């Protein structure tokens, strides 16, 4: 279901954006976050289409963070293939990551829910803050376990949490 909407949302005339985003979106990622959104929506007996849109938003946000993370960490491999920044360079990777974030927010507006927009906007801020804290502590050999877990929570757990929480909003 999601892959159809992902494909239609990425159907644009710019080959560089399509190639770069598609390189990651069409890779062998597990897509656990959007799957959680869909499964929990079904468990809550949701019958609309907002769950699919939200799942795609989550996948776009997640992939944007991966594109940015590979640039920051100078990653060369992602999901067993050359990373996007290794193929197209850092500038393109950052900009396509920004493009995916923008697409996610554009899709959120389609749901016409300020609550959903607020939650996903806050989530994006938490993800960015976690990445910034990670970068700021790269050389910190005295990083406490508490601080490390806080960073990981912001970078990783937050999007999982929201993937599970959003269905409770659309079923109200």
Regions flagged by a language model, labelled:
Residues 1-7, 12:
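Single conserved hydrophobic/aromatic residue that forms the stacking wall/gate
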Residues 15-172:
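Mg2+-dependent prenyl diphosphate-binding active-site environment of isoprenoid biosynthetic enzymes
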């Amino acid at each position: 279901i999601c892959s159809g909407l992902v494909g239609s949302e990425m159907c644009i005339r710019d080959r560089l954006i399509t190639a770069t985003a598609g390189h990651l979106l069409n890779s062998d990622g597990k897509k656990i976050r959007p799957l959680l959104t869909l499964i929990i929506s079904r468990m809550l007996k949701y019958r609309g289409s907002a769950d699919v849109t939200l799942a795609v938003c989550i996948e776009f946000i997640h992939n944007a963070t991966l594109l940015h993370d590979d640039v920051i960490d100078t990653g060369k491999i992602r999901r067993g293939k050359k990373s996007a920044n290794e193929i197209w360079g850092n500038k393109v990777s950052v900009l396509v990551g920004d493009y995916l974030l923008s697409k996610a927010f554009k899709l959120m507006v389609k749901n016409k829910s300020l609550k959903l927009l607020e939650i996903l906007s806050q989530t994006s801020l938490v993800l960015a803050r976690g990445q910034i804290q990670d970068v700021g502590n790269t050389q910190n050999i005295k990083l406490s376990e508490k601080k490390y877990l806080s960073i990981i929570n912001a970078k990783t757990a937050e999007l999982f949490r929201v993937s599970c929480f959003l269905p409770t909003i659309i079923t109200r």
